Amino acid sequence: NRIELMYNFYRSLQDTKLIPFGGKYLQSPSIGVIGNKDPQAVDEGTRYNHNAYLKFTSKDIFKHTDLEASVYGSSLYTIFDFRKANPAQPRWEETSGQSAVKDRKFGVRAQFNSRLIFSDDAFAHIVYGYDYLYNKTSQPLVDGRYWMPWLTSNNHAPFLQIKTTLWQHLSIKLGGRYDHISVKVPDYDVLRNKLSDPQVQVKGGMLKYNNMSFNVGLSYNKYPVFQPFVAYSQGFSIFDLGRTLRAAKADVLAKISTEPVKTNNYEIGAYSDINHWLQLNGSFFYTYSKLGSDLKIDHGFWVVNRTPQKVYGVELSADAQILSNLKAGANLSWFEGKLKSATGKWDTYMSNISIPAAKLAMYVNYAPVKNTYLQLQYMHTGKRDRFAPNASGQYNEGEGIVSRINLLNLTAGVKLKVCDLSLAVSNLLNYTYYTPASMMMARNAEYAHADGRKITLTAVFKY
């Protein structure tokens, strides 16, 4: 038996004399200059983030059955950046402000793992249990007004997962999870953008969701050089419910679109192990959702785009043990996502927030002598330019041009008896580029360069 207890506290606030200056999307970066921040602004960052869990593990609590039970909780308060009142795009009743997130969670999970042995060629693992999560969250402004009221949810979810191996080489996975979620929404007033907008007073109530989701997978591994697999799974989430409620246009919950997002996910691929020195992996996946979860900008605010969506892509990887002390590898991921337009055609691309640019990563690991290592890593992210400027000649937020990035990182280390020393140099060539977030968001004030060369020395002492 084993009992494990963990507590973690994190706090990070930004107190700086610098304020943003300049910045023109696709032309010049925003930089920090000495200045005074707005007197209404407070330090942004995480005021507190408490995390704790208690875990109990028991091997063979019953015959051929292990138990893992845990209780966990967290409490978070994060303040975002200050937004100056902008008459062209008013928000929060035409005032300046700073939004925040307050979140509290408490959960319980009990999981059993049973082993069934029918013969040398047929056996099964069964994982089954129960999840419970209590979550209370809100999005206030630091001045006391509520952009999103306190939402309280309870999620009960029993689950079952079976993995069976037949004839030693055929693996079958089958599972299911039933979610029962109730969300309590209080009576609240929608925080208007303009004072002239009609006041919407929403009558609260209880939102209830019940969903059964399944997954199934097959794999065959008799031949090391070709091990195919295929899988199907269903996804379920009440994605961005708070974002929907804070932009409500109706006064009762029944008139507000609060339906959950359900996805059907398909994957097919193969794994190959060639003489234990070269491993190859490739897969193609496809996901469809009748009710989408992409985000779009509406009068300066993010809202959920409920248009049907599909996402597809490929993932490829290769790892080679060239020498006993030399290893190299690469992996490639490419995604694309489209929305179904009013004409019934899949002719609209999903935003850069949901779909990243293609990514290629390569590495070389070398151990020149015992207890030392060197790693050189190259990362390339591709270009994603799927959208045209709007009528005013500007790119909508989330639809900006994401340009190519090429980075080289170096890590070296040595393991000694009393400590481990490591040296990491990120962006080794001091490559100048804009952050992907600033490129996709297309905001002048946030169009900023990423970090240049950064050197980190770490020492871990053993006792």
Q: Residue ranges of each PLM-predicted region?
A:
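Residues on the lipid-exposed face of transmembrane beta-strands in outer-membrane beta-barrel proteins
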Residues: 1, 52-58, 108-114, 158-164, ...
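Face-selective signature of the C-terminal outer-membrane beta-barrel domain
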Residues: 2-10, 45-195, 219-224, 231, ...
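Transmembrane beta-strands of outer-membrane beta-barrel pores
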Residues: 9-13, 73-77, 132-138, 178-184, ...
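Outer-membrane beta-barrel translocator domains and adjoining extracellular loop/strand segments
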Residues: 16-24, 79-88, 137-145, 184-193, ...
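Extracellular loop and loop/strand-boundary signature of outer-membrane beta-barrel proteins
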Residues: 35-43, 55, 91-100, 139-150, ...
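Membrane-embedded beta-barrel scaffold of Gram-negative outer-membrane proteins
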Residues: 66-84, 219-239, 243, 257-312, ...
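Gram-negative outer-membrane beta-barrel transporters
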Residues: 168, 281-289, 305-391, 429, ...
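C-terminal beta-signal and adjacent terminal beta-strands/loops
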Residues: 328, 370-371, 380-389, 413-463
